[in-house]
Amino acid sequence: MSISCLSASAAKALDAELMSAGAFSIDQLMELAGLSVSQAVYREYPPSQYSQVLICCGPGNNGGDGLVAARHLWQYGYKPTVYYPKPSSPELYKRLCKQLDDLDIPVVKSHDSNHFSQLLRDSKLVVDSIFGFSFKGPVRDPFGSILAAIVESKIKVLSVDAPSSWEIDEGPQKEGPLKDFDPDTLISLTAPKPCSKFYKGKHYLGGRFVSKVITKKFNLSLPPYPGIDQVVDITNKPLSMV
C-alpha cells in the first residue's frame, strides 16, 4: 500500500476541514501533533543518551507543535531548551510558553548567534520545529543563520512535518548554505508532504486524529497506528500524491 502525500494546498484544506466539519480546535490539533513529535523523539533518541534537547521553534503552528513537544519531553525525563527567537503573540502561544515556564524549561526568545552556537554545543539533539507545510522560501534571518549553524554543527536533527528550508512540494534547496540541510529523522504530520519523497532517513507519521469521513473526502491512504502509539514508522514506504 502506498501512503498518500498532501500538497501544501491540500494540507491547508485538510486542516481547515478538521477545524470546521471535524470539530477540532487548534489547541487540540497542536497538542496531538506535539505529542506525536515527542513520541518520535523518544523512539529514536532515548533520554538515557540524548537528554539535552534543543527545540528550535518558528513563529507559526509548526513552532507551536515544538512548544507542546518540549513539555512532553520534560515529562519523559529529557532536559529540553526551547529556542524561540520570534515568539507569536496569540494567546495560545503565550499559554504554551507559560506551561513551559512552570516546569522551569528555558525558553530563549531572542536571537544571538554566539548564544545559539553554545546551545548547540551543549545539546545532543535538535528538534527542527521552525517551518511547516505553509513555508515558501527564501529563508529569512534569524532562521537562515540558525539552520546554517545546525548544518555546520553536525548535530542529530529531527524535523517536524517537513525539513525547514525545503520547498513543501519540490524538496530540498538546490544551492546555497542550506542545500545540505538533511535531518536524521522526519516526522510527517497528518500525511507526508511531497518533499518527503526526496527524504531517505528515518521517517515517522504522526497525527492520529483523521476521521474516516475526512479520510474518504480527501481520498487518503494512511497506515494504521499500532496499539496506543501516536506515531507509525513509514521509513522507505512508497508514497503517492492524492
UniProtKB/Swiss-Prot annotation:
Pfam families, alphabetically?
YjeF_N (PF03853)
- Transmembrane helix: is it a keyword of this entry? no
Keyword annotations from UniProtKB, A to Z: Cytoplasm, Isomerase, Metal-binding, Mitochondrion, NAD, NADP, Nucleotide-binding, Nucleus, Potassium
Quote the record's binding site residues for K(+): 62, 128, 164
Q: Name one GO cellular component term.
A: cytosol
Q: Which SUPFAM superfamilies match?
A: YjeF N-terminal domain-like (SSF64153)
Q: Which GO molecular function entries does the Swiss-Prot or TrEMBL record give?
A: metal ion binding; NAD(P)HX epimerase activity; nucleotide binding
Give a GO biological-process term. Answer: nicotinamide nucleotide metabolic process
Q: Which residues form the YjeF N-terminal domain?
A: 11-221
What are the required cofactors? K(+)
Reaction catalysis annotation = (6R)-NADHX = (6S)-NADHX; (6R)-NADPHX = (6S)-NADPHX
The domain of life for this entry's organism is Eukaryota
For this protein, what is the EC number? 5.1.99.6
Task: List localization entries.
Answer: Cytoplasm; Mitochondrion; Nucleus
PROSITE patterns per record = YJEF_N
Tell me how the cofactor is bound. Binds 1 potassium ion per subunit.
Q: Which residues take part in binding (6S)-NADPHX?
A: 61-65, 132-138, 161
The answer, when asked if Methyltransferase is one of the entry's keywords, is no
The record's similarity note reads: Belongs to the NnrE/AIBP family.
User: Which PANTHER family does the annotation name?
Assistant: NAD(P)H-HYDRATE EPIMERASE (PTHR13232:SF10)
NCBIfam families reported in the protein's UniProt record: yjeF_nterm (TIGR00197)
The record describes the protein's role as:
Catalyzes the epimerization of the S- and R-forms of NAD(P)HX, a damaged form of NAD(P)H that is a result of enzymatic or heat-dependent hydration. This is a prerequisite for the S-specific NAD(P)H-hydrate dehydratase to allow the repair of both epimers of NAD(P)HX. May have a role in meiosis.
What is the protein named? Answer: NAD(P)H-hydrate epimerase
Give the organism the record lists: Schizosaccharomyces pombe (strain 972 / ATCC 24843)
Q: Which gene encodes it?
A: mug182
